[in-house]
Amino acid sequence: AIMRYVRRQHSMIIGQVTAEEIKIQIGEVYPRNEELTMNVKGRDYKTGMPKMVTVSSKEIYEVLRRPARMIADEVMAVLEQTSPELVSDVSENGLTLTGGSAQLWGFAELLMERTGIPCILADDPDSCTAYGCGKSLAWINNMEEGPINIARKRAMKSGL
């Protein structure tokens, strides 16, 4: 989304690495009090020559706002289909955010506002998701045969 925005608004082509740097340094999904700016280097869309523009956090907010809200909506959808016991546990203990996007300015606040559930950032959000997936491989056979998954499979087959 950031690459497309820079191309359309600034007539400049940037790569994925630069887009990620923009997201990390000035990205926000919840408005902050101060506006940040960043000089971004790329290639002019028309001439192909090197070009530099200044991009603001307010611009990036407009780019990231919709995808972040879509993620929040999906979290809400999952919570709505989660068992009452688990939702009670989650509402008491909060949501732990993982992954790179969890570190976006205001992401925890956005989710907290939408769900009403406290959100915290994991200690090592970039790698804890992969670590957890690796640990879960030890339990994969049990997970396939567990009563919850059997009930889920039945519900999915019946179209619920």
Annotate the PLM regions.
Residues 63-90, 136-139:
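Phosphate/ATP-binding catalytic cores across multiple sugar-kinase/actin-like superfamilies
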Residues 109-135, 139, 143:
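Conserved phosphate-binding/catalytic loops in two-lobed NTP-binding clefts
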Residues 31, 87-111:
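Glycine-rich phosphate-binding loops at beta-strand->alpha-helix junctions
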